[in-house]
Amino acid sequence: MKKQKSGLYEKSLIRIILFLCINFIHFPLYGYYFKNIGVKDGLSQPSILSIHQDELGRMWFGTLQGLSIYDGNEMITLKGGEERFDNYIKNNTIYRIVEDSNHNIFLRADNSLVCYKLTEDRFQCIRERDINAVNSIGGKIYIAAKDSILEWNEGDNRWDFFKKIEISSGRISSIFCNRSSEWYIVTSKGCYKEYKNGLWKCILDIPSIEMLYESKDGSIWMATRSNGLYQFDNDICVNHIVNNPGTANSLCSNDVRVVTEDQSGNLWIGTREGLNKYSISTGNIESYASGGFSGDMKHSSIFALYLDKEGGLWVGTYYGGVSVFSPESRIFKYYPANKERSDCLNFPFVSGIVKDKRDDLWICTDGGGLNYMNHKTEIFRHLSTKDSGLVADNMKSICYDKNKDKLWFIRHFE
């Protein structure tokens, strides 16, 4: 049984290393394990547009066709207000999920807004049309309706006028307020900021801004549909992060949909072609995408990101459901192939791996001979027919005899 388990482990490790070597441009030195939740687990639909965690710790997923709620083990069904639920949520697109200071949940379902009363377990539609944007700011709920911002008055169960947007800039698609109580809106013509004199000024005239996000250092990040990610400090663009084809330190795509920050201050960027981790302090970028292997995201096109109370990052994809992982926990390390470097393999195709009694690794390759890695220093020694007396570089399998401390190989015969 031990031998069988060891063989399974080695085969899994081989698959991981093969996958990483083939995809070395898109993957970082260290990796994460993603847990995936899909339709087979009870999701109403595999396209996730919004994610939120409520006061009870449950995860809410807004999809193209309705709402799903996950308690950590399974999807659950809320029973209150079935008629309202069916009319406004079931089969509708849930674009946004936010929460007020009383822990009520607000859902933008198509162009209506539905409130879920947590203490009453009841749904209530509080506006049936003309919802262009919704946000929770300071525990209060605000919506953009035509050329105005309205504030929800829960005590009187009504919408109160908050402010008029005195600009002719098209439909408002997003409303935002930073920690300095400065207001921003996004329209089809760009991002506008309100100044103390009540005037609105365009600070980024790009017509495809997806969202605004404020990081812990006070920077405002603007995700765009085709122009990458912009960083603003004091209304000045100080950084523009884009996709540079063929470059490792690059965004997966210039189509950026969503941004959030983890507990360590790293920025996570969801794009149309994968997930990026951006170090604000160093400028380093790591990339993650679906590769079809166990532990990967199921889909690379990302629409939603959410950091939960325990620090887990939830990723909503276009057609792969939800993926969740811990940004603070790495489970594997990637060793690329570069025969000129002692910290790399000398050949990208790995056919077998064994560990000797000193815990060092012996890795046979299908074309590069044998690689030995010291587990303490992580330095490789490359052994091939040219410099070590091996009879072949095309090795198909490797076995270790612990009693005799010897290696056995199966090689390819021409």
Regions from the PLM with identified roles:
Residues 1-414:
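Carboxylate-rich, polar loop motifs that coordinate divalent cations or form catalytic acidic clusters
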